[in-house]
């Protein structure tokens, strides 16, 4: 018995020694006591492998102080890392990490696989984590020995893009394994390209038949579409495309896609017939793209499934080299796309496209574009949505964030999106915690609690989350006064926790700006607000946005400094006499739609509208406005003004003119004056006081406001051929 035990122990000890010897021989000793023991071998040598080698050497040196030599086409020895050999274990951008006799081989499945293999090695085995531009963590060590490694990985999507100011940092962009459309599409033509290919300024006057027929007439314009059944359009497009590919021989993909705008597709008899045959507007577009794909079989053509082309055709299937860029712009974001009505409409379209194509590019929207510096708690939707895209044959994915500082928790959202685009099976909540602990350090528990409270309050409120939202939409829900007080307490504690670390403190303060902006927006709708307290909040917001270089508050480049200046002018109380304040209004021509319900109060309530039309503003669509104000008694005044909004992206343009008239009895009217507008094609949101002043005061009880609109959107506009809006709010009589 004792003898058997000794034999058993002998064999166990022998096995352990052999196992230890195996693992020791399989290990890759890179650095010992701060001295390089291994080399980096590029095999073969090319720009991608050179970049991968440089990245590895850079971070090994930051960890250990040792600089690994980079050599080419050398025979590997123990301790070396070989970068760039090909592998069949991974697909495009994928990689394999394989230990072999003390040598680690980082193999590529194609494209940037070797770079991403280096990133995986640094993250998983050397403990380096990159969070945002110039922000990473590592643990210094004079010794680096790699264990035996055998793994392979391929991304879920062959193309992965999101926006962040971090993309300006070349290490960040590679670390997040991100790509850019300009690397793929010829001449950077990747979306809304009709007018780039056949400009209306060049062809529109002589050949209006090339462009959409809308409401019975041809409408050439920057945002009009092509008449896709016109054979001359096809031949001209082919000539232009051929010249572009000849000028960019390194590219094989181009977008041939509708101009931005809704409903501007051609409705001529020939195009209408195709639409009826296909059961969808997209049928005409896919037929056209298939003809291009047949003319250029070695090229790939991307086209939009966006707004009026979102639903797939019933008959025609896209050819394999036709890429469908499907956009979910109209969906609400408070829950995953499968869980609300607007999302389910998109999901139905996605499933329809996935039945007829394996070449789908998803364009997803993950921020509030009307107020990027506004809370947008959709983190719980990211993983299920990206998994949905993957299940339905999407091979390319663009998660549209905003790349500017101050965008709501941009750093965390961009980081999480990058991780999930590579592998959508990861747990989003775990990713959030990992990011917060590394980026916000000791402030992480408070900001995590803030995000969870915000998310819970959004869901409990039942209010949808829209990508063109206003904080005012949520002032009774997730941004009510009680919750905002709690949010501020959490931020106060977060700031206190990192007060000794200026860099981390500034990250917390930058992330607080959306809450501060929301409170300012909500405060301006409260006639009983604390004016001095609001002024102090505005001053702090002004100071912090300047400090952190916040460039814009929305996608239309409205700058924070302009917002603060206008806020002081429009929303902070000043002592001025307004005879129209609170006075009743009678409409001769009522506002459009829902605006008729509250317009009579909103025009004289003393509360100015903000940079989005969804609150305080009163609108008329495609027709003129006419209303009277009863001042209550005969008054003396010399100035009348009305406040107008320009928001071109929402089809809200300046009207032609506004005319003011006065009367004692509301029957006989005398002209007071007319203000004539100048056309403005800017995408920036603007306000304009249409003021008329007379040299001598007049006496009257009634003031009439008559606004002449422009009728239809002009040829340069997104809504060419469709009714234009104009919006106004406060009318003042002084």
Regions found by a protein language model. Give the residues of each.
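Bacterial Sec-dependent N-terminal signal peptides
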Residues: 1-28
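Feature activates predominantly on carbohydrate-active enzymes
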Residues: 45-55, 59-61, 88-287, 293-297, ...
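Short, well-ordered secondary-structure micro-motifs within conserved domains or adaptor modules
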Residues: 69-91
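Structured mid-domain segments that build the active-site/substrate or prosthetic-cofactor binding neighborhood
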Residues: 232-233, 344-443, 449
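Substrate-binding cleft/loops of secretory-pathway carbohydrate-active enzymes
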Residues: 302, 306-330, 373-380, 406-414
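Glycoside hydrolase catalytic-domain groove-lining segments
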Residues: 312-319, 326-368
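Catalytic domains of carbohydrate-active enzymes that cleave complex glycans
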Residues: 420-590
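Aromatic, loop-rich ligand-recognition surfaces of beta-strand-rich domains
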Residues: 608-673, 686-734
């Amino acid at each position: 018995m004792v003898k058997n035990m000794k034999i058993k122990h002998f064999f166990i000890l022998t096995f352990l020694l052999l196992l230890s010897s195996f693992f020791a021989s399989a290990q890759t000793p890179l650095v010992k006591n701060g001295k390089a023991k291994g080399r980096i071998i590029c095999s073969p040598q090319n720009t991608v492998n050179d970049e991968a080698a440089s990245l590895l050497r850079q971070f090994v040196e930051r960890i250990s102080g040792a600089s690994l030599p980079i050599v080419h086409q050398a025979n590997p020895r123990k301790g070396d890392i070989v970068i760039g050999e090909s592998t069949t274990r991974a697909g495009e951008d994928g990689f394999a990490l394989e230990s072999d006799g003390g040598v680690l081989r980082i193999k590529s499945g194609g494209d940037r696989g070797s770079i991403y293999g280096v990133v995986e090695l640094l993250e998983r085995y050397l403990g380096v984590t990159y969070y945002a531009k110039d922000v990473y963590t590592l643990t210094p060590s004079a010794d680096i020995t790699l264990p035996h490694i055998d793994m392979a990985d391929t991304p879920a999507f062959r193309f992965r893009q999101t926006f962040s100011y971090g993309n300006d940092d070349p290490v960040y962009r590679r670390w997040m394994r991100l790509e850019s459309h300009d690397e793929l599409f010829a001449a950077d033509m990747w979306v809304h390209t009709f007018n780039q290919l056949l400009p209306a300024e060049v062809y529109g006057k002589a050949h209006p038949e090339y462009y959409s027929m809308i409401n019975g007439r041809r409408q050439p314009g920057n945002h009009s579409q092509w008449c896709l059944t016109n054979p001359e359009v096809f031949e001209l497009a082919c000539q232009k495309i051929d010249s572009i590919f000849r000028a960019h021989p390194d590219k094989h993909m181009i977008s041939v896609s509708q101009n931005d705008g809704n409903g501007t597709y051609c409705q001529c008899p020939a195009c209408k017939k195709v639409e009826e045959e296909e059961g969808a507007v997209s049928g005409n577009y896919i037929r056209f793209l298939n003809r291009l794909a047949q003319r250029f079989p070695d090229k790939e053509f991307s086209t939009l499934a966006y707004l009026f082309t979102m639903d797939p055709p019933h008959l025609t299937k896209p050819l394999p080299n036709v890429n469908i860029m499907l956009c979910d712009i109209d969906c609400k974001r408070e829950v995953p796309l499968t869980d609300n009505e607007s999302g389910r409409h998109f999901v139905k379209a996605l499933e329809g496209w996935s039945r007829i194509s394996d070449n789908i590019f998803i364009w997803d929207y993950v921020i509030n574009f009307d107020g990027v510096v506004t809370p947008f708690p959709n983190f719980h939707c990211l993983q299920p949505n990206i998994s949905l895209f993957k299940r339905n044959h999407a091979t390319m994915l663009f998660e549209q964030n905003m790349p500017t500082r101050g965008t709501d928790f941009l750093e965390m959202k961009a980081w999480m999106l990058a991780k999930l685009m590579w592998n959508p099976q990861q747990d989003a909540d775990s990713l959030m915690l990992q990011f917060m602990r590394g980026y916000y350090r000791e402030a992480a528990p408070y900001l995590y609690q803030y995000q969870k409270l915000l998310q819970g309050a959004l869901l409990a409120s039942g209010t949808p989350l829209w990508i063109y939202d206003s904080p005012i939409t949520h002032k009774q829900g997730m941004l009510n006064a009680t919750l905002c007080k709690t949010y501020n307490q959490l931020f106060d504690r977060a700031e206190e926790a990192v007060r000794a670390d200026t860099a981390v403190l500034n990250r917390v303060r930058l992330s607080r700006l959306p809450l501060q902006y929301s409170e300012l927006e909500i405060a301006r709708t409260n006639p009983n607000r604390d004016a001095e307290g609001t002024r102090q909040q505005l001053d702090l917001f002004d100071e912090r946005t300047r400090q952190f270089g916040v460039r814009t508050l929305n996608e239309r480049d409205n700058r924070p400094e302009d917002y603060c200046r206008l806020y002081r002018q429009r929303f902070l109380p000043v002592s001025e006499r307004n005879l129209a304040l609170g006075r009743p209004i009678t409409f001769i021509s009522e506002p459009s739609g829902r605006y008729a319900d509250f317009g009579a109060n909103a025009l004289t309530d003393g509360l100015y509208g903000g940079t989005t039309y969804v609150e305080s503003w009163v609108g008329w669509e495609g027709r003129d406005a006419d209303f009277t104000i009863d001042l209550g008694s005969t008054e003396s005044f010399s100035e009348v003004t009305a406040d107008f909004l320009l928001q071109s992206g929402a089809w809200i343009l300046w009207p032609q003119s506004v005319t003011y008239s006065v009367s004692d009895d509301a029957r006989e009217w005398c002209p007071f004056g007319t203000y004539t507008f100048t056309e403005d094609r800017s995408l920036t949101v603007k306000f304009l006081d249409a003021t008329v002043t007379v040299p001598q005061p007049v006496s009257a009880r009634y003031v009439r406001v008559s606004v002449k609109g422009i009728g239809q959107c002009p040829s340069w506009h997104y809504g060419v051929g469709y009714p234009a809006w104009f919006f106004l709010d406060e009318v003042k009589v002084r």
